[in-house]
Regions:
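Residue-level signal for pocket-adjacent positions within structured domains
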Residues: 141-143, 160, 182-184, 222, ...
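Short, conserved active-site entrance elements at the starts or edges of catalytic domains
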Residues: 165-197
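C-terminal functional extensions of proteins
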Residues: 282, 300-305
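Double-stranded beta-helix
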Residues: 161, 179, 226-228
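Left-handed beta-helix
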Residues: 185, 190-191, 196-197, 202-211, ...
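Terminal amphipathic alpha-helical/low-complexity segments used for targeting or macromolecular assembly
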Residues: 1-176, 303-305
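Regulatory activation segment
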Residues: 236-243
């Protein structure tokens, strides 16, 4: 039970905060049922991973009488939840008439079907990514280990799924998906980024890949790499313009390197050394490295710390 002094203040505190909600700012909206449900979208990621990797991430709710029966039930659940969330996202932030709502529901159903039709294409890309992980990491003992445990493959899986929704112009949901992966893995890949086959992320923590980045085939990124935009005063006026670099085939970028700018192209077969800061194009086959800083070594008895 609350102390008398605090209990007597609850009414006034409530009224003060309610009054603050009337200021008309974006943060003052009270429409919790007119926005996509993040928890449902996270649950959808789990269902989609089970569709993509049918031998892994089993849900005990689905009893496997046959692969077809199990998959049919899983796809039905996924389609139902996804089309509901897409419809909410399409309505979000706007007033919708009853007639328009019916059109939105039809559009959401069409988007859901078109997205699910892309699952085989996504799986084909992920099969190449899985092979790139295995070929590129001698510490990997099996493909099972990579699928189950590697954060890089989780981030890429979520991104490839979210990218298909992004291409369908589904609002909000692709970003919710990739930010979930970001929180789980420390790998921040915008759903708008275009990524080719055989993509390998080693370790991965701290990697940032911006919206208009183009990554070609067989690219390898190490932890802490940024494929970003140059900071300008353009702000929202730059939306829709190329702001992020293009990374050619078979490029390797080592830890801590930053490659920035929409006009920056890293040519095929180039290697970018750790901690490099690049804002201009690099020719194919080049090796870029930061000159080693000089190390000073002294005996501990001469060091006052």
């Amino acid at each position: 039970m609350l102390p008398d002094t605090l209990e007597g203040s609850i009414h006034d505190l409530t009224q003060n905060i309610l009054a603050d909600y009337t200021a008309g700012r974006p943060i003052d909206r009270i429409e919790p049922f007119n926005q996509p449900d993040r928890d449902v979208i996270i649950a959808l990621i789990g269902k989609l991973r089970r569709i993509v990797f049918p031998g892994y991430f089993r849900d005990p709710a689905y009893h496997v009488y046959s692969a077809a029966h199990s998959l049919s039930a899983l796809i039905e659940d996924t389609a139902y939840l996804l089309q509901k969330q897409i419809a909410i996202a399409l309505r979000c932030g706007s007033s919708v008439t009853q007639e328009a709502a019916a059109d939105i529901d039809r559009q959401a159903q069409e988007m859901t079907v078109r997205f699910l039709e892309k699952i085989p294409d996504v799986r084909a890309l992920l099969a190449t990514d899985l092979q790139a992980f295995y070929d590129g990491d001698p510490a990997a003992t099996s493909l099972d280990e990579i699928i189950i445990a590697y954060p890089g493959l989780l981030a890429i899986t979520v991104n490839r799924l979210a990218h298909e929704l992004f291409l369908l112009k589904v609002p909000l949901i692709p970003r919710i998906m990739t930010e979930y992966a970001h929180g789980r893995t420390g790998i921040d890949i915008h759903p708008g980024a275009t990524i080719g086959k055989y993509f390998f992320i080693d370790h991965g923590t701290g990697i940032v890949v911006g919206e208009t980045t183009i990554i070609c085939d067989s690219v390898k990124l190490y932890q802490g790499v940024t494929l970003g935009a140059l900071s300008t005063r353009g702000g929202q006026s730059l939306r829709g313009h190329r702001r992020h670099p293009t990374i050619g085939d078979r490029v390797t970028i080592y830890s801590g390197a930053s490659v920035l700018g929409g006009d920056t192209v890293i040519g095929h077969d180039a290697v970018i050394g750790g901690n490099a800061f690049i804002t201009h194009s690099i020719a194919p086959g080049m090796r870029v490295s930061v000159k080693n800083q000089e190390l000073e070594m002294r005996m501990m008895k001469d060091v006052n710390w």
